[in-house]
Design a protein with these regions (language model features):
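Phosphopantetheine-dependent thiolation modules in NRPS/PKS and related acyl-activating systems
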Residues: 2-37, 41-47, 51-79
């Protein structure tokens, strides 16, 4: 899977989790950029991403990711 394909899939996941079809994530996207992205939604998002990509994040990754680009890096390493 390419980086671009990961972003396409992540866009769908983010749109579903946050119920907002206008969301388009990029490397620099953070929780501050998405209105409803709080700590509870972060957990829901991580579970949805894990399910979409058939992988699991470590607790350190769940709490340590600073932006979507870092999330993509982890996903690509696990593919």
């Amino acid at each position: 899977m390419t980086r671009e394909e990961v972003f396409q899939k992540l866009n769908s996941v983010f749109q579903d989790v946050f119920d907002d079809d206008t969301i388009a994530v990029c490397d620099e996207t953070t929780a501050a950029d998405i209105e409803d992205w709080d700590s509870l939604e972060h957990i829901n998002l991580m579970v949805a991403v894990e399910k979409a990509f058939g992988m699991k994040f470590s607790m350190a990754e769940v709490t340590g990711l600073k932006n979507v680009g870092e999330m993509v890096d982890v996903i690509l390493k696990r593919q």
